[in-house]
UniProtKB/Swiss-Prot annotation:
Modification note: Is synthesized initially as an inactive proenzyme. Formation of the active enzyme involves a self-maturation process in which the active site pyruvoyl group is generated from an internal serine residue via an autocatalytic post-translational modification. Two non-identical subunits are generated from the proenzyme in this reaction, and the pyruvate is formed at the N-terminus of the alpha chain, which is derived from the carboxyl end of the proenzyme.
Pathway assigned in UniProt: Phospholipid metabolism; phosphatidylethanolamine biosynthesis; phosphatidylethanolamine from CDP-diacylglycerol: step 2/2
TM stretches of this protein: none
Active site positions: 183 (schiff-base intermediate with substrate)
GO biological process: phosphatidylethanolamine biosynthetic process
Protein name as annotated: Phosphatidylserine decarboxylase proenzyme
Cell location: Cell membrane
Classification of source organism: Bacteria, Bacillati, Bacillota, Clostridia, Eubacteriales
EC number(s) on file: 4.1.1.65
Pyruvic acid (Ser): residues bearing it: 183
GO cellular component: plasma membrane
Top enzyme category: lyase
Reaction equation(s) it catalyzes: a 1,2-diacyl-sn-glycero-3-phospho-L-serine + H(+) = a 1,2-diacyl-sn-glycero-3-phosphoethanolamine + CO2
Amino acid sequence: MSDMRRPIIAREGWPFVGALVALAVLALFVHWALGAVLAGLALFVMWFFRDPERPIPREDGLVVSPADGRVMFVREVEEPRFVGGRALLVSIFLSVFDVHINRSPVAGEVTYREYVPGKFLAAWDDTVGEVNERAYLGLVTDGGHRVLVSQVAGLLARRIVTWPAVGDRLDRGQRFGLIRFGSCTQVWLPADSEVLVRPGDRVVAGQTVIGRLPQ
């Protein structure tokens, strides 16, 4: 799957920015203050949909964060959907101030994809990964490791975008989608992986090393 240099503002944000700019121009004919407020909102939306370039770690076996945000928890759990047994779950909360572009935690082939409708609880709730609307993407690395990522909608984030199809290949740190306006991203690693982050740690998508796959 191609990941050539993308615009600094994700294309999914352009309709919002365009609408707000048009409204701001029209509002100037009503009152300058209203136009200024709408122009400010347009700038905020542009900032929200920012898509900066990131230096991707290249060492073999590393797992990078799939999202910007803060680690909510790290747990050993059963994951029957794709991993097929015990797995290490890392859950990351994204506030509205974080970059919302998701990046692949590992290099591998997309062999599983599923959308699950659900609720829209606040993304910092521990149960959101089980009850909220979410989209799963499963990757198999060249070493045969199975890694699962979930994009979880939140109270405000009610639009999940996932670009790859089954059969596509992703590089480590490659963009694969986004979630709009505050959300949660989760990643399941093989149970014998080494997790290198703790709850409360700040992580950066595609850049922060959150774990190491077993040899």
